[in-house]
């Protein structure tokens, strides 16, 4: 089934009569991407039951690529297409694209921006990115982690279009306490 639960929905006008009677074209990450997996898990409730998918029952299928610029080019050349990729790439290409608000778990329509991502209101399409560290090497990476959790680290994160955790957030504090606990126990 498509994401509206109806296998026969293929036109924008079938979702809303004010939309054109043109094929719904979808573009995004390829199936090897974490973005693809995350988006599918977040948006398709029946995905694991063999229900909703990206391309099932679509005449034009699903245009996918490991290269975000391929998706942007597809969206630019297909005005009735919709696509998805990470916020960082949207920020880099926002002069060519429009980001659509989504209805979050509170029922509000929220557009993606640094504030709504940081405060968690842009859900279910917000996810954390992790730094994984082997505890045996914590002494060697501690200074890097101090930098990553500093204001300078936040500047780097912002400069590439990602949204840093706020130093006052409980998630940031909890994460830093875990780093300190490992250092103190090593």
Residues covered by each model-derived region:
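Flexible loop/hinge segments at secondary-structure junctions
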Residues: 1-186
């Amino acid at each position: 089934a498509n994401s509206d639960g109806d296998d026969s929905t293929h036109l924008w006008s079938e979702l809303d009569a004010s939309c054109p009677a043109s094929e719904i074209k979808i573009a995004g990450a390829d199936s090897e991407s974490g973005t693809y997996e995350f988006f599918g898990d977040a948006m398709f409730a029946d995905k694991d039951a063999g229900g909703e998918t990206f391309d099932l029952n679509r005449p034009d299928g699903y245009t996918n690529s490991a290269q975000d610029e391929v998706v942007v080019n597809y969206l630019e050349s297909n005005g009735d297409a919709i696509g998805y990729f990470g916020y960082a790439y949207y920020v880099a290409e926002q002069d060519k694209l429009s980001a659509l608000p989504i209805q979050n778990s509170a029922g509000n329509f929220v557009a993606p921006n640094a504030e709504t991502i940081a405060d968690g209101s842009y859900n279910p399409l917000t996810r954390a990115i992790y730094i994984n560290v082997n505890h045996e090497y914590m002494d060697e990476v501690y200074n890097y982690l101090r930098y990553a959790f500093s204001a300078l680290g936040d500047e780097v994160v912002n400069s590439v279009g990602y949204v840093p955790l706020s130093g006052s957030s409980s998630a940031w504090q909890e994460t830093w306490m875990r780093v300190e606990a490992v250092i103190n126990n090593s």
